[in-house]
Amino acid sequence: MLIQFLLFKYLYPFPNFMQDSYNYLRSTYTNADANMWPVGYAKLVRFVGFFSHSDTLLVFVQYLCYHCCALYFFFTILDLTPSGKWAKATIFAFLFLNPAILYLSNYITSDVYFISISLVWISQLFKLIYKPGRLLLLAHLLVLLLAFTVRYHALIYPVISITVIVFCGVSVRTKLASIIAIITLISGFIYYTTGQTGKVMGTRQFSAFSGWQMASNAVYAYAHMPVRPVITVPSAFAAVHQRVTIYLDSLQHIPMAFRPDRPLMAFYLWDPGSPLQPVPGAAHIADNKVHLERMAAVSPLYNKYGKYLINQYPLQYIRYYIWPNMLQYANPPAENMSVYNDGADSVWSIAQTWFRYKTDKVYTVSDKSEMRLFDYYSAFMVFIIILFTGVWIAYLLIGGRKFTAPAFRQAFRMTTFYWIVHFGFSVLASPVVLRYQLFNMILGVTFSILLVDMYLKRARLG
């Protein structure tokens, strides 16, 4: 692990940055308790900064954190069912020799930190199935709250946790106490964050991000409709709809392949040229406090505007946003994972300030050509989904219940339930990209390999 890290840092002396990075660093620098993105990761960066502002130390902490959590997950999986050497070796290799994790650890984003927390979260749920206890439940509550502070994708985690707790082998009293504790903790966090968002961003709401995401998704679908009838919108939406209409009219003569909003990404959310931006052309949006406050101020309106467009064109929304995003869930684009520093040779001032760089210039020893590997991870995700679906079908056809351990059966069902809920949430919430799918990849590979190993053993035994 250490040799792998040292070699990588020789090739990439500086971390990888993208737009999200600078918002996290601004939250870190100001010690904010609310911002456009959740601030849990910023608290980790600030904690590391208490010891040193070295970017290498931060990257190493992220890398080490993942490996510790992955080890916990690995040994938890081994407790679920006996497995062959090849199965253990394959799962171990995917967990600890996966280049995606190495490169993602070098990003100043919450991704690898959230994956680490998620590995502990789901491992605890597996343990609750076959070895429930009050201390484990208490630890799980803390991990669940931690996940909630780091990524909004954790909104589905309480649903999964409560479902498992309902069916785990503890007393009814303990179950009720745990469920009430989860609801209380999460509600308290939402209430606190809502208040802090009002203080920091000027508008009281849990997440300014959600309203913008709703509008972005709706406008993306609206923009890709071949014919857009002229509609009279409510007066509250008149100004923003006029900007959207004028902008979309300007794209009429641009071939789809060259349109800035062609890929299903976050163009309408973050691009300075987006007609949704309060001030078009604003620079460094993610670290522009005044602009972010303006974005937060219109977020409630944009939430309603997005819902209005969806209600006006529900079938078109399904066709031009939901359906493409469903396909993107199975075949996620590499996005920032195949690019270093968004293609730039410099970083924003907040990164230079926090990491105490002498200049804003960054460089790599590598020619970065190997990063194109992540373009093929999309095909790998398709393969994993097909494999996972295949082992599930085989499990049903050959009566998997008869030859699998009870703990494994429960964990397998729980993982499937998680994946179904995650699929629904992800497709509806925002455009899916590769870094959001790495945790799912780990789960898919792990359970597929374990089941294939069981099937092979059963075949040998006749």
Regions found by a protein language model. Give the residues of each.
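Membrane-interface alpha helices of multi-pass inner-membrane proteins
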Residues: 137-151, 185-193
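Transmembrane-helix motifs of polytopic, lipid-linked glycan transferases
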Residues: 60-82, 116, 120, 124
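Membrane-proximal stem/loop segments at transmembrane-domain junctions that anchor or position
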Residues: 206-354
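Loop-to-helix entry region of an early transmembrane alpha helix in multi-pass inner-membrane enzymes
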Residues: 39-43, 51-71, 104
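Membrane-interface anchor segments at the N-terminal boundary of transmembrane helices
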Residues: 56-64, 291-292, 299-303, 308-312, ...
